[in-house]
Amino acid sequence: MRELSLHILDILQNSVEAGATRVELSVVEDLAADRLTIEVRDNGRGIAADKLPYVFDPFYTSRKTRHVGLGLPLLQAAAECCDGDATITSEIGVGTTLTATFQHSHLDRAPLGDMVGTLMSFILGGACDLRYVHRVTGRLEDGKLENWGDGADDTEARQFDCDTAEIRAELGNIPLTHPEVRAWLRQFITEGEATLTQT
């Protein structure tokens, strides 16, 4: 896939298919450590221990109908090509956590891509609540790592946080798919993502 956001959308959809009612997506760009970490945690049915060794096998599926899932093997291959890895932990009845790591500056690492489109697509699908956290630690200025100090504690991070459960609570009976809410949500996510790259 040309963008990591497409891998993320695929993993989010896997969570929905596993019966999740809440998914937590974390994207951490640690520029000082030259690391990009993507983590998706859900409260779905989980994966049986005897099936876990096969989740990254492109020739294995537990499905009896529909397509064979290549999303996880492709994500793992993308991570490994960038000096990273992909791992899954899961517990029946509790949920599943997928973690993928990449060398942030690796030449072969696909760009994060259209996170706004990915998030809007998933959120407006309405299948479950999503908490999204995107954190960038440090920044590169002319090829050198610079700090983002706020003068108080010299924090070197920026973070955008979006939780649809909190938004739904504020909206009451108004659905996220309402045209005005949808427009606000797109603007909120777009502006939140933009704050992570501002100098």
Where are these regions (language model features)?
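Glycine-rich GHKL/ HATPase_c ATP-binding element in histidine kinases
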Residues: V94-T96
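Short conserved segment of the HATPase_c
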Residues: I47-P58
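Acidic ATP/Mg2+-coordinating residue in the GHKL
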Residues: D42
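Short beta-strand-loop-beta element adjacent to the nucleotide/active-site pocket used for signaling
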Residues: V28-I38
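Conserved ATP-binding N-box helix of the HATPase_c
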Residues: M1-V28, A78
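Conserved glycine-/histidine-rich ATP-lid loop and adjacent helix of the Bergerat-fold HATPase_c
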Residues: L74-G84
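N-terminal assembly/transducer modules of large multi-domain enzymes
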Residues: H104-T199
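A short beta-strand-to-loop motif within the catalytic HATPase_c
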Residues: I88-I92
